C-alpha cells in the first residue's frame, strides 16, 4: 500500500519564548516491511534543522529556534510503501538470530516498563509456559491484553505508570503496548515499543483520513518470524495497514516531540494527522 502522511504539531505559548530546542521523531522508519520514498520537515518560525539517526535506528531531527516566538509549528510530509501483506506467515528466508547484545535492551526492564511481579502473575494465571516465546504464543499474549484491558480515553496520561494500568485494567494504545512489552519480557521474548499510524481504513479514492494522534503497538522477536508487530489495542498482527515511525524500549524512547525553551510561559499542544492512500 502506498500512503501519503501529513503530521502537524503546533505549540502555542502564553508569552514569548526563546532558544526552543526540540527532538522530532516522526520518521518514517525504513526496513524490510516498509519503504520510505519521500520525506520533508518544515518549521515555523524558521529555525535550524539537523538530521541524525538515534541508537535505535530512528530518523530524528533536532529543531532549534533562537528568536522570540509565541508559536512553533512542525509539519512533516511523508510518502512510503508498506509491503507486509501476510504478517502471520513466516518469511521464506529464516530471520537472522539476535545476538545477546541486540537483545539486552528489549529483554531488560526499561524506564516505563519495569519488572513487575504483576506480569509473571498474569502469565501464570493464564497458563503460559515456554510456548509464549513462539509467534503463536506472542499472538495469544496480545489477545490476552486486548481481552483483559478496556480501551478508555482520558483515564491515563503519558505519565501514568504501567503498574497503575495493571491495577485498573484500562487505558489507551500506549498503555496496552507497555503491558504487552512487560508480559513478553517476563516470558523471555525480546519486545520493543513502536509508534506510528494505522492506515488500514483508508478509502481508495485519495480522500484523507484524519486522526488526532499517532498509534502505538509492540514488535516482538521470535526465532521463526523475526521482528513482527502485535497491536493489542485492535487485536491484530501488524501488516501493511500500519505505518512504523520509530521504535524503542518504551514510549520514552520514541516520543514524537521532546524539547525545552527559555521563558516564563505555559504551552498548549495541538496535533493533526492526515493520511491518504495513493496507490
Q: What are these model-derived regions, one by one?
A:
Residues 9, 156, 233:
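Ser/Thr-centric signal marking residues that sit
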Residues 27-29, 44, 77-79, 221, ...:
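Structured loops at beta-to-helix junctions and adjacent beta-edge loops in soluble globular domains
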Residues 80, 89-91, 98-171, 179-181, ...:
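Secondary-structure boundary elements
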Residues 143, 175-265:
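Hydrophobic/aromatic-rich core segments of domains that either
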Residues 1, 7, 20-22, 39, ...:
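Structural beta-strand/beta-sheet cores of well-ordered domains, especially the beta-sheet scaffolds
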Residues 1-125, 131:
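Linear, non-domain "peripheral" regions
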Residues 13, 48, 94-95, 103, ...:
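Glycine-rich, flexible loop/turn motifs
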Residues 47-53, 65-67, 81-84, 114-123, ...:
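Noncatalytic linker/hinge segments flanking ATPase motor cores
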Amino acid at each position: 500500500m502506498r500512503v501519503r502522511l501529513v503530521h502537524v504539531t503546533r505549540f502555542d505559548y502564553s508569552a514569548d519564548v526563546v532558544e526552543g530546542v526540540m527532538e522530532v521523531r516522526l520518521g518514517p522508519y525504513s526496513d524490510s516491511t516498509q519503504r520510505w520514498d519521500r520525506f520533508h520537515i518544515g518549521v515555523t518560525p524558521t529555525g535550524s534543522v539537523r538530521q541524525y539517526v538515534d541508537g535505535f535506528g530512528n530518523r530524528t531531527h533536532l529543531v532549534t529556534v533562537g528568536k522570540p516566538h509565541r508559536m512553533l509549528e512542525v509539519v512533516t510530509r511523508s510518502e512510503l510503501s508498506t509491503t507486509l501483506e501476510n504478517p502471520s506467515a513466516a518469511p521464506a528466508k529464516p530471520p537472522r538470530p539476535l545476538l545477546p547484545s541486540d537483545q539486552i535492551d528489549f529483554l531488560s526492564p526499561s524506564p516505563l516498563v519495569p519488572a513487575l511481579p504483576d506480569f509473571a502473575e498474569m502469565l501464570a494465571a493464564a497458563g503460559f509456559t515456554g510456548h509464549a516465546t513462539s509467534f503463536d504464543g506472542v499472538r495469544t499474549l496480545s489477545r490476552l491484553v486486548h481481552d483483559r484491558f478496556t480501551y478508555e480515553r482520558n483515564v491515563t496520561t503519558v505519565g501514568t505508570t504501567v503498574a497503575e494500568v495493571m491495577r485498573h485494567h484500562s487505558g489507551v494504545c500506549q498503555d496496552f503496548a507497555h503491558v504487552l512489552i512487560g508480559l513478553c519480557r517476563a516470558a523471555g521474548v525480546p519486545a520493543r515499543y513502536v509508534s506510528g499510524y494505522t492506515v488500514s481504513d483508508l478509502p481508495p479514492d485519495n480522500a484523507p483520513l484524519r486522526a488526532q494522534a499517532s498509534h502505538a503497538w509492540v514488535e516482538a522477536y521470535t526465532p521463526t518470524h523475526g521482528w513482527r508487530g502485535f497491536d493489542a489495542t485492535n487485536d491484530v498482527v501488524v501488516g501493511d495497514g500500519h505505518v512504523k515511525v520509530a521504535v524503542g524500549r518504551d514510549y520514552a524512547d520514541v516520543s514524537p516531540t521532546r524539547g525545552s525553551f527559555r521563558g516564563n510561559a505555559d504551552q498548549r499542544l495541538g496535533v493533526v494527522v492526515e493520511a491518504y492512500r495513493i496507490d
